[in-house]
Swiss-Prot record:
Name of the protein described by the UniProt record: Doublecortin domain-containing protein 2C
Domain of life: Eukaryota
Domain Doublecortin as annotated: residue spans: 16-98, 136-217
Signal peptide limits: none
Region (Disordered): 233-255
Tissue: Expressed in testis and spermatozoa (at protein level).
Keywords assigned by UniProt, alphabetized: Cell projection, Cilium, Cytoplasm, Flagellum, Repeat
GO biological process: intracellular signal transduction
UniProt subcellular location: Cell projection, Cilium, Flagellum; Cytoplasm
Cellular component aspect of the GO annotation: cytoplasm; microtubule; microtubule organizing center; sperm flagellum
Species this chain originates from: Homo sapiens
Length: 364
């Protein structure tokens, strides 16, 4: 029988357990690592193992003690149950790593369902629960087009939160001028939000033009109940208009609109106010402008009469109007050059005819 060779020595060194933190992270809870000679035979192998488990920028390149930040240089310096900080190329950052405690996740608060009052017989869910959870079924007319039947549109529940998306959804089936910009009820009330939409109601989609008041409810697609309701509203409005028109008094200025009467540029009839006092007649007794005695310089002076040969220069606007001859009279006096030319041409033609007649005259 053969003999066995000497067996290899078995390493009986117990494995070490350490806790590793991340450098500069106050929320990172330390991880436990078991150091065995088989997996981490060298310090470089240990750093590679830590790089796989601890997320450090550019990998784990250094180990420090958590309290004073002393650098660990080998496996022999590691103590069983010790705590260390893994870092990359950066410097050690002082934090209280030992007392980092894992935080419990915050509890999600459940919304309590609003229940109706006990003494109330109505058992209806609250509006805030059902508003954005139920889609809307509406019927939409095109503005000003009575002969086009209303389009049935289903607005999804997820689009009710945005009014622009609601209008875009309506614009996929209704095509007014310029696209759907506004939404009105059949009697002309503007809708500003999806909260005003009601199931199975009728609306009018309007684009760039204004809303046109047409009897949309007379369409055969509209239920008879809705038609009767809108017809009653129209009758009541017409009665009110007749009563208001009878009760009004006729206006003074029928031909002039009221805006022009109140305008600054509108001339109003007013009597002239005489602010100046009447002039005092000259020559009356006690007149301040009348000299009490005639002056000596003017006594014996003769009045000089104007001569007829003297010419006075009068301004243009004060001169008498002169009669200007019209162009027709001037044209009559001018010689008729065209007529004379025609006469000369006629004479030349006669002379030529005479010469031709003489040349072709037969000889006896």
């Amino acid at each position: 029988m053969g003999t066995r060779g000497p067996s290899a020595p078995v390493d009986t060194t117990p494995a070490k357990t350490i806790v590793v933190y991340r450098n500069g992270d106050p929320f990172y809870v330390g991880k436990k690592f078991v150091l065995s000679r088989r997996r981490a035979a060298t310090f470089e192998a240990l750093l590679e193992q830590l790089t796989e488990q601890v997320d450090v920028p550019f990998g784990v390149r250094r180990l420090f003690t958590p309290t004073r930040g002393h650098r660990v240089l080998g496996l022999d310096a590691l103590q069983a149950g010790g705590k260390y900080v893994a870092a990359g190329r950066e410097r050690f950052k002082e934090l209280d790593y030992i007392h980092i405690v894992p935080r419990k996740p915050a509890k999600i608060r459940k919304l309590k369902e609003i229940k109706p009052v006990v003494h109330c017989d109505i058992n209806v869910p609250s509006k805030w629960q059902t508003y954005h959870r139920i889609s809307r079924h509406i019927n939409v007319f095109t503005n000003g087009r009575l002969f086009i039947p209303p389009a049935k549109i289903i607005i999804p529940k997820f689009s009710l939160s945005d009014w622009d998306i609601v209008l875009a959804t309506i614009g996929e089936k209704v095509f007014p001028l310029g696209g759907v910009r506004k939404l009105f009820t059949m009697n002309g009330h503007l809708l500003g939000d999806s909260k005003d939409l009601q199931d199975n109601h009728f609306y009018v989609a309007v684009g760039l033009e204004t809303f046109k008041y047409f009897p949309y409810w007379k369409s055969p697609r509209v239920p008879s109940e809705v038609q009767q309701r809108y017809a009653n509203v129209e009758k009541n409005s017409q009665r009110k208009k007749k009563v208001d028109s009878k009760g009004k008094e006729p206006c003074k200025y029928d031909g002039i609109p009221p805006k022009t009467q109140d305008s600054v540029y509108y001339a109003k009839e007013e009597k002239k106010k005489t602010l100046a006092e009447p002039l005092v007649q000259r020559g009356a007794e006690g007149d301040v402008y009348k000299a009490p005695t005639p002056s000596k310089e003017t006594q014996g002076a003769l009045d000089v009469k104007e001569e007829h040969n003297v010419q006075l220069e009068v301004p243009v606007d004060q001169r008498q109007a002169e009669i200007v001859k019209e162009d027709e009279e001037i044209h009559e006096n001018t010689p008729d050059f065209e007529g004379n030319k025609d006469k000369e041409d006629a004479r030349l033609c006669e002379d030529v005819e005479r010469k031709m007649a003489r040349e072709w005259k037969p000889v006896d």
